[in-house]
A protein has these predicted regions:
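Bacterial N-terminal signal peptides that target proteins for export
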Residues: 1-9
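Soluble non-cytosolic domains of exported or imported proteins
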Residues: 29, 67, 88-92
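Bacterial N-terminal signal peptides
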Residues: 8-18
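Sec/Tat signal peptide C-region and signal peptidase I cleavage site
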Residues: 19-23
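Structural motif corresponding to alpha-helix initiation and N-cap regions
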Residues: 42, 67-70
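Periplasmic/extracellular electron-transfer cofactor-ligation site
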Residues: 25-56, 79-83, 103-107
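Axial heme c-ligation environment in periplasmic c-type cytochrome domains
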Residues: 54-62, 74-104
């Protein structure tokens, strides 16, 4: 019980620290260019496409995950995955790719 407060406080601080990255307007058009150059070898980046790598979900499927948010994508892009290389994107590129993925959400 006494460890819950530090853990909760730490998660809160990480969330707050991520917010400035989203405070500036992201550019989905720039994001599709970054995605084409960085992600398309494995992921389908446009709606209706099939991913070249069957383990890499298409971006429109990622966008359609219930509750998908910029912070969730930010965490995902900064966390290593077993079958995905560790990407090194600038803050601006990451923000733009996230904006592009979220632009694929059906409303």
């Amino acid at each position: 019980m006494k460890h819950q407060l530090p853990v909760g406080l730490g998660l809160f601080m990480l969330t707050v620290a991520a917010l400035p990255a989203f405070a500036q307007e992201a550019d989905a058009r720039a994001g599709v260019t970054v995605a084409q150059n960085t992600c398309s070898a494995c992921h389908a980046i446009r709606k209706g496409q099939q991913s070249a790598n069957t383990n890499a979900p298409p971006f429109d499927k990622i966008a359609s995950v219930p509750g998908m948010t910029p912070i969730a994508l930010q965490a995902s892009l900064q966390t290593s995955h077993r079958s995905m290389p560790n990407l090194i994107l600038s803050t601006e590129d990451r923000r733009n790719v996230i904006a592009y993925i979220l632009s694929l959400q059906t409303k």
